């Protein structure tokens, strides 16, 4: 579509230029130049200038003025790099700008939207009991709830450890023999907290049947295949 418009505009420019070329010899062919001829040339020059500006605005995809403005002789605002457009109709005043910013920043939140869960850095074990007692105390059912609530508030509060990324890793180095009063205590402690895979034995090959497990069938260790197998040798002998 834009290519068609550009080609049409080029044809129009060529036609206007050819008309000007024909009009200039006719205007200067006489011995005297009249005011009518000069005014006609000036009008044609202004029309060419407006046509060039209109073509430029068409290439940019924007139209700064209407056809009535072009016919009446008003200048079409052109896009200049590094300068502001003289047309201030698209600008917002202070009140309109404030209204737009307030509409963007104070946008009402969708209550049905799922909120991201916050990290729980420990939770009081007695928090649920305190909430329940607060609800009962607000109803005013009995005065014993106040005594229980005061005992909970005065008592110590225990918090769960917050989950962390490396909770399954040892954050402290293994204790050495120097950290224990005696070598015997160190050996007892190390055996008690030994890892399960530290005393794992290597699987042995099953040669024959085990004495402790008679349900297992006899299974021999596979022999290394050196050369041809016996079945192939038998087939070769039978073929001979």
Swiss-Prot record:
<feature type="propeptide" description="Connecting peptide">
    <location>
        <begin position="72"/>
        <end position="81"/>
    </location>
</feature>
<keyword id="KW-0527">Neuropeptide</keyword>
<feature type="propeptide" description="Connecting peptide">
    <location>
        <begin position="124"/>
        <end position="147"/>
    </location>
</feature>
<keyword id="KW-0027">Amidation</keyword>
<feature type="propeptide">
    <location>
        <begin position="210"/>
        <end position="219"/>
    </location>
</feature>
<feature type="modified residue" description="Pyrrolidone carboxylic acid">
    <location>
        <position position="115"/>
    </location>
</feature>
<feature type="propeptide" description="Connecting peptide">
    <location>
        <begin position="151"/>
        <end position="168"/>
    </location>
</feature>
<feature type="modified residue" description="Isoleucine amide">
    <location>
        <position position="226"/>
    </location>
</feature>
<feature type="modified residue" description="Isoleucine amide">
    <location>
        <position position="207"/>
    </location>
</feature>
<feature type="modified residue" description="Leucine amide">
    <location>
        <position position="51"/>
    </location>
</feature>
<feature type="propeptide" description="Connecting peptide">
    <location>
        <begin position="131"/>
        <end position="168"/>
    </location>
</feature>
<feature type="region of interest" description="Disordered">
    <location>
        <begin position="23"/>
        <end position="44"/>
    </location>
</feature>
<feature type="propeptide" description="Connecting peptide">
    <location>
        <begin position="124"/>
        <end position="148"/>
    </location>
</feature>
<feature type="propeptide" description="Connecting peptide">
    <location>
        <begin position="84"/>
        <end position="112"/>
    </location>
</feature>
<feature type="modified residue" description="Alanine amide">
    <location>
        <position position="81"/>
    </location>
</feature>
<feature type="propeptide" description="Connecting peptide">
    <location>
        <begin position="124"/>
        <end position="168"/>
    </location>
</feature>
<keyword id="KW-0165">Cleavage on pair of basic residues</keyword>
<feature type="modified residue" description="Tyrosine amide">
    <location>
        <position position="121"/>
    </location>
</feature>
<dbReference type="GO" id="GO:0007218">
    <property type="term" value="P:neuropeptide signaling pathway"/>
</dbReference>
<feature type="compositionally biased region" description="Polar residues">
    <location>
        <begin position="26"/>
        <end position="41"/>
    </location>
</feature>
<feature type="propeptide" description="Connecting peptide">
    <location>
        <begin position="171"/>
        <end position="190"/>
    </location>
</feature>
<feature type="propeptide" description="Connecting peptide">
    <location>
        <begin position="124"/>
        <end position="149"/>
    </location>
</feature>
<feature type="modified residue" description="Leucine amide">
    <location>
        <position position="60"/>
    </location>
</feature>
<feature type="propeptide" description="Connecting peptide">
    <location>
        <begin position="149"/>
        <end position="168"/>
    </location>
</feature>
<feature type="signal peptide">
    <location>
        <begin position="1"/>
        <end position="23"/>
    </location>
</feature>
<feature type="region of interest" description="Disordered">
    <location>
        <begin position="212"/>
        <end position="240"/>
    </location>
</feature>
<feature type="propeptide">
    <location>
        <begin position="24"/>
        <end position="44"/>
    </location>
</feature>
<feature type="propeptide">
    <location>
        <begin position="227"/>
        <end position="240"/>
    </location>
</feature>
<keyword id="KW-0732">Signal</keyword>
<feature type="propeptide" description="Connecting peptide">
    <location>
        <begin position="150"/>
        <end position="168"/>
    </location>
</feature>
<protein>
    <recommendedName>
        <fullName>Myomodulin neuropeptides 2</fullName>
    </recommendedName>
</protein>
<feature type="propeptide" description="Connecting peptide">
    <location>
        <begin position="171"/>
        <end position="199"/>
    </location>
</feature>
<feature type="compositionally biased region" description="Basic and acidic residues">
    <location>
        <begin position="227"/>
        <end position="240"/>
    </location>
</feature>
<comment type="function">
    <text>MMG2-DPs (Myomodulin gene 2-derived peptides) bias egestive feeding programs toward ingestive ones, and modulate accessory radula closer (ARC) muscle contractions.</text>
</comment>
<keyword id="KW-0964">Secreted</keyword>
<dbReference type="GO" id="GO:0005576">
    <property type="term" value="C:extracellular region"/>
</dbReference>
<keyword id="KW-0873">Pyrrolidone carboxylic acid</keyword>
């Amino acid at each position: 579509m834009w290519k068609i418009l550009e080609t049409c505009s080029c044809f129009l420019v060529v036609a206007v230029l050819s008309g000007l070329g024909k009009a200039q010899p006719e205007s200067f062919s006489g011995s005297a130049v009249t005011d009518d001829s000069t005014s006609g040339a000036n009008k044609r020059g202004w029309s060419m200038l407006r046509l060039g500006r209109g073509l430029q605005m068409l290439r940019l995809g924007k139209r700064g003025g209407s056809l009535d403005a072009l016919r009446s002789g008003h200048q079409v605002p052109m896009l200049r790099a590094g300068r502001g457009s003289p047309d201030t109709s698209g600008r917002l005043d202070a009140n309109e700008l404030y209204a737009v910013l307030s509409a963007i920043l104070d946008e009402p939140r969708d209550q049905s939207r799922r909120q991201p869960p916050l990290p729980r850095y420990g939770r009081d074990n007695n928090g649920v009991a305190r909430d329940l007692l607060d609800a009962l105390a607000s109803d005013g059912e009995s005065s014993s709830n106040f005594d229980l609530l005061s005992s909970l508030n005065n008592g110590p509060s225990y918090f769960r450890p917050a989950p962390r990324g490396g909770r399954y890793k040892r954050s402290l180095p293994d204790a050495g023999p120097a950290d224990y009063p005696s070598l015997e205590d160190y050996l007892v402690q190390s055996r008690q907290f030994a890892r399960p895979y530290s005393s794992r034995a290597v699987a042995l090959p099953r040669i024959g049947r085990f004495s402790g497990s008679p349900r297992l069938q006899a299974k021999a260790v596979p022999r290394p295949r050196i050369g041809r197998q016996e079945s192939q040798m038998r087939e070769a002998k039978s073929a001979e």
